[in-house]
Amino acid sequence: YPIFGLSLLVMAVGIGGGLIITNANIPEIAFVNMNPTGRSVFPYLCITIACGAISGFHATQSPMMARCLRTEKDGRKVFYGAMISEGIIALIWAAAAMSFFGGIPQLAEAGTAAVVVNKISVGILGKVGGALALLGVVACPITSGDTAFRSARLTIADSLKYKQGPIVNRFIVAIPLFVIGVALCFIPFNVVWRYFGWSNQTLATIALWAAVKYLANRGKNYWIALIPAMFMTVVVTSYIVAAPEGFVRFFGDKDIKVIEHIAIIIGCVVSLGCTAGFFMTNKKSNLITE
């Protein structure tokens, strides 16, 4: 991981520096919804940019990261620092994507995300950028896939209390996961990504609610996790209600705007229900403690 993380950081610094040196201009982009299907920005954008502002997959890797720390005191520097660093890297790449191609139509025709990264890297950093792009776009996702399969295997084995010491036991759990992975390769990427995005953000929502309960049980300020948990509950609920891969088909021929409004209302109701449930259980816990 250190070498891939370093390549991403070096590439981001190089791209950012290149934008400054070349005095790159970001075109004036109107703050309007450009979705050709007429769908709203919310909640779809919050699912499309999965692993951006919040990520359930990142949450599952926290225990693995924690095992690499020498002391618990390093946790704040590592996790908070990683969060800020990832945000800066995201802003650099957003600026690069907007300025390099000259406008929205050109960016839309540039190709897939991997192609865009390669074009920008080679265009700004030359051959060095191409090598870094190879590490960041090809090698890094491969290691992420490896981590995903390993995490899934360990999660399933732990849930079933199935020991993973013997190599045969590992294969028994891993092979079915590999079969599922191969099957997913035959499904269009944009469909897989939408399901991944929703499941990823749903997992993040669950992690936030777990954090809320954890903080409350220890008498800490749980609002710092409660407000994001409430917001994300609205996001994931309203998305799965209104999205094409969700329950939108049950609304028949209703106008999509009407469906989206209904979905957001349902999301708010679910969020308020979860919040009420938390306060009720938290009050009971306090009474038992007293």
Go through each PLM region and give its residues.
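Helix-loop-helix junctions that connect adjacent transmembrane segments
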Residues: 1-59
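Extracellular/periplasmic helix-exit of transmembrane alpha-helices
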Residues: 18-31, 80-119
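Helix-loop-helix connectors at the membrane interface of multi-pass transporters/channels
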Residues: 63-87, 106, 114-120, 145-172
